[in-house]
Amino acid sequence: MSDNQSWNSSGSEEDPETESGPPVERCGVLSKWTNYIHGWQDRWVVLKNNTLSYYKSEDETEYGCRGSICLSKAVITPHDFDECRFDISVNDSVWYLRAQDPDHRQQWIDAIEQHKTESGYGSESSLRRHGSMVSLVSGASGYSATSTSSFKKGHSLREKLAEMETFRDILCRQVDTLQKFFDACADAVSKDEFQRDKVVEDDEDDFPTTRSDGDFLHNTNGNKEKVFPHVTPKGINGIDFKGEAITFKATTAGILATLSHCIELMVKREDSWQKRMDKETEKRRRVEEAYKNAMTELKKKSHFGGPDYEEGPNSLINEEEFFDAVEAALDRQDKIEEQSQSEKVRLHWSTSMPSGDAFSSVGTHRFVQKPYSRSSSMSSIDLVSASDGVHRFSSQVEEMVQNHMTYSLQDVGGDANWQLVVEEGEMKVYRREVEENGIVLDPLKATHAVKGVTGHEVCNYFWNVDVRNDWETTIENFHVVETLADNAIIIYQTHKRVWPASQRDVLYLSAIRKIPALNENDPETWIVCNFSVDHSSAPLNNRCVRAKINVAMICQTLVSPPEGNQEISRDNILCKITYVANVNPGGWAPASVLRAVAKREYPKFLKRFTSYVQEKTAGKPILF
């Protein structure tokens, strides 16, 4: 055959020097870098089956290895300066190893390189060694039959390809042998036919011989054997045709079985790759979808700073998104406030307490009258309507106070128009839903009972602007526009913006009053009344939406008589608080959002403020 030489280029005839056999297994002690704390530690290292494994010690091999790496794609790097060290890296995993001496290191490197080389696909010695698993013997006289059961399904495609190469060599030699046999047979047949034709021609020319009795004598069997002798073709005496045929059949069966297994392996790999491709395709689809959604959200957010995505008559943000954004902004403000309060507490305990009291020491339960001024706003004074300083809003203040004393103290628990929205201990918050021209004007009323403080103390802290920032967390800034009297001022304040809602500002008159009891059994009552007014010093501006308010903090002090002749202490006093708020927020915020914010923020304000008053008055003289 013309291709016989090329087909046999990787035949089974091998030079003994090149056939080194399988790589030698190796084991021994090497120092391995563990970490920067423990440094180099001796480990028992085993090199076997193209895998490098290490154990803590030789005695602990039965407990399993501490780690192992496959050497197929390993990179072995001798250290440039340390003659005993070499590194083995596979992807991101790196082993730092040290041998006893440079020769020991070189022995390990050579052994590892040998395992790595023998693990590679396509090496000549690897294919020859794999082909030797086929139990077919090449010889001139015949080949042993090979059962297809010897081709185990567990072999890899690489091994099966090596077997196919061995089968190819065997089959080529078998074909050559059979071709020689057929050529010899053909030559013998052609010579026999030529000789037969020649003998026949000679017989036709000869005369028959005569016997003694006169009869003719014809040549029969004897002459035939001489004329047509049994000729054995030259060159086929040493060939067992039947054996060659059986071996050829076994070889072709082996090729078909191995080829079938190769196809099966390729189909499995194709299925595996198809699954991986499907998985990667699905991942890509998800990533593209997530990217698309992220870009959509990013485009949204890029426009959220514009006027179309803020509170307004033509806002593009829907009610649900509006509520979520407001809630998220309030949560952030709460976290900032918690951090601020924690810092204040830390600074409070790290510094010494100032001497003196915020309140004037006036005894334990006797009320002393003294002039009221903003500089001593926390001092006690009996503020009654008759002693108020007259100013241009006096009649308006009087009307507001009388309305609150008449209507705000009424019990609304049984009124069907009022809804109980929050109840936490002594605190109850009611709301009555009112809308006017699409604007939420829900009146709100809260009742609370606080122990250890008086109504005068609560109202003073609520009215006094000097301590406003200590408990008020929703104000961005404020200032007193005008002082009308010692107990009445006009305040302009700007509230912190809660995106996407517009920022609000408020201009209001704040007045504090003491309402004298009609009889000695009635509780002492203090009131702070805040209601919106106009002032030339604080005109409307485009930056904020001006809100209108009518708020009252009404506090009544209840005293339980102490036992015996003991003086009244804070354990004997209770402040009953009624807080009412009528707010027109203005703007275009959704009604559901305003109601949800009010339900959330009003109880928080009341708890925070009353806790602040209790904290500030603890241990100080009682101010009735």
Swiss-Prot record:
Chain positions with Phosphotyrosine modification: Y372
Annotated domain remarks: The START domain recognizes ceramides and diacylglycerol lipids, interacts with membranes, and mediates the intermembrane transfer of ceramides and diacylglycerol lipids. The PH domain targets the Golgi apparatus.
Region Disordered: start-end pairs: 1-24
Coiled-coil intervals: 263-303
Domain PH: 23-117
GO biological process: ceramide transport; intermembrane lipid transfer
Subcellular location: Cytoplasm; Golgi apparatus; Endoplasmic reticulum
Record-listed an N-acylsphing-4-enine binding positions: E472, Q493, N530, Y579
Subunit-level organization: Interacts with VAPA and VAPB. Interaction with VAPB is less efficient than with VAPA. Interacts (via FFAT motif) with MOSPD2 (via MSP domain).
Catalytic activity as recorded in UniProt: N-hexadecanoylsphing-4-enine(in) = N-hexadecanoylsphing-4-enine(out)
Motif segment (FFAT): 321-327
Species: Bos taurus
START domain sequence ranges: 389-618
Annotated gene: CERT1
Protein name, UniProt field: Ceramide transfer protein
One Pfam family cited in the UniProt record for this chain: START
Cellular compartments per GO CC: cytosol; endoplasmic reticulum; Golgi apparatus
Keywords: Coiled coil, Cytoplasm, Endoplasmic reticulum, Golgi apparatus, Lipid transport, Phosphoprotein, Transport
Residue positions, PTM Phosphoserine: S126, S132, S135, S315, S373, S377, S380
